[in-house]
């Protein structure tokens, strides 16, 4: 028997053991875990330093190092996310609807756990805790397979969670970490149909594509953020400048950072110089501009076709000038990864049209795309941001990790 099969068997057994846990027990444990995370900050930072040292040795960029880095403040934020999950209403057992049918059968539809969730993710060690807290609150067992660059951090975090579970009298196999970073083991997890009820990949385009091609278990696609901001003809250009600077430069390595800028031709000649001057005072950006935008920049390079399809995760941004709202919507729908999109405008009708017709999980008016986040949306820590339409869409909180079951009670009913 392979190690992966053993992990799968233990996860399946754990899912049965934690299925009956009450809301009170789950919340008490999560509150304890939030405190333990803060108390053990130095242990976690020491493990993270090993990952950072390895990353530096392998020449990983500063921006990607930021995804990997834990700090005392970030650990506090992770703990706050866990506590927020504890404070949220428990969806398990929630009655969605109840009725008596024509035969006199009493029928209830309730929310129930999915069972065993597998998570394959890259770089960001906070995902280990975020994913576990949501899975545990919804009575699911979880198998975590992080990237090799965060192995020490993930091992320390999962060890801490497992110890806390055991001390609370709960099976530690409610969470397990796949420590083997090989692609072969990852593929085995993708195909573990006997044990895994759903697989959630969270990472770059290559990871998502690999999972789509090789997984045999059900998959919820998340993550890739080719995110656009459209500056409309009726935009407040001061507002647009602040929003673009925030969405591009605040944390360029995250999936809700803006990657593409679409500008109406009526304001392009005023807005581009204004934006370029302002952003250079904060953080210079490499502009990859189309033929109409290029001469309006002091410094830019001609965009290639692939630039409009790329999630840069860096201080780089593609720029497209359009002649109408309709062209902007068409362009964005052609290139979007269906994550988050935004329009800056004072035209209410244009805003409504944009929100109705742009095909993305989150569509903003006059706000930065950086808000697409489970914590910000009040969902607690998120397990990912779904870019598909089936089962879940957008930041995935507790309800996204549940299924439904029909409970039918009769009194000797038979069907004639």
Swiss-Prot record:
Pathway: Amino-acid biosynthesis; L-proline biosynthesis; L-glutamate 5-semialdehyde from L-glutamate: step 2/2
GO cellular component entries: cytoplasm
Pfam families, alphabetized: Aldedh (PF00171)
Keyword terms: Amino-acid biosynthesis, Cytoplasm, NADP, Oxidoreductase, Proline biosynthesis
Annotated Gene3D superfamilies: Aldehyde Dehydrogenase, Chain A, domain 1 (3.40.605.10), Aldehyde Dehydrogenase, Chain A, domain 2 (3.40.309.10)
Catalytic activity of the protein: L-glutamate 5-semialdehyde + phosphate + NADP(+) = L-glutamyl 5-phosphate + NADPH + H(+)
Subcellular location: Cytoplasm
Enzyme class of the recorded protein, top EC level: oxidoreductase
Principal localisation: cytoplasm
GO biological process, alphabetically ordered: L-proline biosynthetic process
Molecular-function GO terms, alphabetical: glutamate-5-semialdehyde dehydrogenase activity; NADP binding
Protein EC: 1.2.1.41
SUPFAM superfamilies: ALDH-like
Membership in a protein family: Belongs to the gamma-glutamyl phosphate reductase family.
NCBIfam families registered for this protein in UniProt: PRK00197.1 (NF001221), proA (TIGR00407)
Role played: Catalyzes the NADPH-dependent reduction of L-glutamate 5-phosphate into L-glutamate 5-semialdehyde and phosphate. The product spontaneously undergoes cyclization to form 1-pyrroline-5-carboxylate.
Name under which the protein is recorded: Gamma-glutamyl phosphate reductase
Gene coding for it: proA
